[in-house]
Curated annotation (Swiss-Prot):
PANTHER family in the cross-refs: AP-5 COMPLEX SUBUNIT MU-1
Record GO biological process: endosomal transport; protein transport
Every MHD domain range: 206-476
Function as written in the Swiss-Prot or TrEMBL entry: As part of AP-5, a probable fifth adaptor protein complex it may be involved in endosomal transport.
Xref: InterPro entries: AP2_Mu_C_sf, AP5M1, MHD
Bilayer disposition of the protein: Peripheral membrane protein
The protein, known as: AP-5 complex subunit mu-1
Top-level lineage group: Eukaryota
Example of a GO cellular component annotation carried by this entry: membrane
Pfam families: Adap_comp_sub
Principal cellular location given in the protein's record: cytoplasm
Gene of this entry: Ap5m1
Family according to the record: Belongs to the adaptor complexes medium subunit family.
Amino acid sequence: MALRAVWLIRHEPGTPLGGTVKFSRRYPTVEKRAKVFNGMNYVPVPEDGPFLKALLFQLRLLDDDKDFVESRDSCSNINKTSIYGLSVGGEDLWPVIAFLRNDMIYASVPLVEQALSPRPPLISISGVSQGLELLLGVHDFLYSSQKNDTDLHSRLSQLPDLLLQACPLGTLLDANLQNSLNSLNFVSVTQPQKQPAWKVGTYKGKAQISISITENVKSMQYGKQDIADTWQVVGTVACKCDLEGVMPNVTISLNLPTNGSPLQDIIVHPCVTSLDSAILTSSSIDTVDDSAFSGPYKFPFTPPLESFNLCHYTSQVPVPPILGSYHMKEDGAQLKITVNLKLHESVRNNFEICEAHIPFYNRGPITHLEYKVSFGQLEVFREKSLLVWIIGQKFPKSMEISLSGTLTFRVQGHNRQPFDHICIGSTAYVKLNFRIADYTLTGCYADQHSVQVFASGKPKISAYRKLISSDYYIWNSKASAPVTYASLLP
């Protein structure tokens, strides 16, 4: 006798999607019970996008839906109830309660406390009547005294708090939401909302939300068969929410493209109020496969006044953005170097900055240099024993560049500067520094249109992305190098 999920969808003919999800609520604890009860026939509740598409198709509300579909339109499938089966991802989600009133689609998925094959009679599923009762109660609440769209928007903003009272943890207690509203109003009159201890004040001014996604890519490349190259992406989502009210509620969704790399090891700010269990259990220790959770990643929270990090995450991308090799060897008094870099074809070729630093420790100042560079320009800092290869904002069309040269140094006795305890002898590296704006290696982005704000006023929402290199090293393949772990190759 519980509900797995509830949706309110505005039917919008003529738009690309045909509708917009105005409200959705999932109950993870009920979902876990569904896994146990339904066994091998369990079908998870889909995200809003796939559910919206499947529901509009089943209800024949898509603008371009002109063809006859036997599984839906044949005489043997005439629907005499408001119960449907939705085909989502090749699986059949049943039962789904849905009906259309006043251009608003009301939908819910009740818990079936028994096996789904064969389908049990509807009269034996108590959650069906509960789902219908709740949806009708929501409809009555939205349109009982609604005069215009502003009133409707105001009532929609009250639904999260009302469902906490009327349907906690997916169990319906009272379908009359007006009773819950009266109860909340009574509490607000007798016990004014307290300022939380972690929030030092309230904001007054223009409403706005800023979301910034920064990904740092780390890499250690050795150019050796017996040592595996390593790379990892570490992301941070920073937010600044200027919203009026003591406890405004915001929900931000992080999305991935079809070929995006799933987010893992997600750590959230304490202001986040709830999370899908799939987000919490996604770990880099597990092997990434097609079944890995790939979003949307929804974060409902009550923001503090100051800028804060909403979450941190890692991701295992297939390849590093720039592949490189570094060969350095001593030839008498001279040092010969060769550096090759290749930008992976999947990476945006538009840098704010891209340069390679080639330091020479424990050798003294550079006295002579002969070099050949296929692209960019080379700057020489003789006293610092440093070469800086300025690549610029783009790689050439071939995506490959190279640098070769011969150097000599002036030995200053035992006081050679700069000094390093690791880069002794031929142990040396090239360090890449680059930054790409409006881009992430995982493809992660914040959809501004899916941000839900339950506060007074309509905020201006802005989103930013950037990829930054961090500890991006290419070690000399002709010498030993420090490694975090060795490969398991025989």
